[in-house]
Amino acid sequence: MTDKTSLSYKDAGVDIDAGNALVDRIKGVVKQTRRPEVMGGLGGFGALCALPQKYREPILVSGTDGVGTKLRLAMDLKRHDTIGIDLVAMCVNDLVVQGAEPLFFLDYYATGKLDVDTAASVITGIAEGCKQSGCALVGGETAEMPGMYHGEDYDVAGFCVGVVEKSEIIDGSKVQNGDVLVALASSGPHSNGYSLVRKVLEVSKTDPEQFELEGKPLADHLLAPTKIYVKSILSLIEKVDVHAISHLTGGGFWENIPRVLPEGMQATIDESSWQWPAVFNWLQQAGNVSRHEMYRTFNCGVGMIIALPAEQADEAVALLNSSGENAWKIGVITQTDAGDAVVIN
């Protein structure tokens, strides 16, 4: 009988010990996100969460998202600490536009070879995003898959569930002629348009760590974490009658605003009401990107747009600014029989 080498999972490229070490590293930060409705801790086959008792007719709202090729830029620049905030933001911001309070979040982290330090940095960012949005990080999956990803490259996805009172769902059906649009400033490109960002960097031969914009590296502008608007919006909808909220993500102004407009309504955006942050001016100039394409690809400094009655617009702006946002009136809703759903002038 010939002797054969005894193979292990580690020989195949999967390090179970590294996975266990990661769990030990992240337990503390995950615990900080806990909500009273969560039952049990990490390690179960499934996470249990009760519905908050304040809801009479609770409706669950769910969403899933990633961070696109912003992740490639983060990996290239070896900056992993805020990409987790981006991941949470992309999910919870999509929930809150419907009036939903985020309850719990799960993440999926996949890599060719698990680097515990990198993964811990990413998941610490996820926990920070959960704290900012008031939702619990109840579980996740870390998949080490040799041969599926190059080296220590990784991908992340997020999954979030929230709850809203049935009678208070925000779906755009109340939008009407004369409504005012209020904008909330973004922190940068957020997590959209990064394939174009990377192409502009390539074509312009720009090193984002060396090139400075407004006194700091371009990389700082490009990797600024996506703003999480949950707490300020949940506070706002308790005080004013919000008709619709649009989260400006992929598709920019042209595609996201119409998603919350009833048929026959047109949003007119006043371009003079704000100035593009420097990073967007740089992207447009360095990439010779058309104005239409900028508004189609990027948020251009606007992360959210809220439609509400004209008589409540000033109050809404004041409330949002007092909660730490940079808010302003950006446009109006009018009735139209024809033409584009969004006009920017």
Curated annotation (Swiss-Prot):
Its EC number is 6.3.3.1. Pathway: Purine metabolism; IMP biosynthesis via de novo pathway; 5-amino-1-(5-phospho-D-ribosyl)imidazole from N(2)-formyl-N(1)-(5-phospho-D-ribosyl)glycinamide: step 2/2. GO terms for cellular component: cytosol. This is Phosphoribosylformylglycinamidine cyclo-ligase. NCBIfam families: purM. The keyword ATP-binding applies. It is found in: Cytoplasm. Its main location: cytoplasm. It comes from the Bacteria. It catalyses: 2-formamido-N(1)-(5-O-phospho-beta-D-ribosyl)acetamidine + ATP = 5-amino-1-(5-phospho-beta-D-ribosyl)imidazole + ADP + phosphate + H(+). One of its GO terms (biological process) is adenine biosynthetic process. Belongs to the AIR synthase family. The keyword ATP-binding applies.
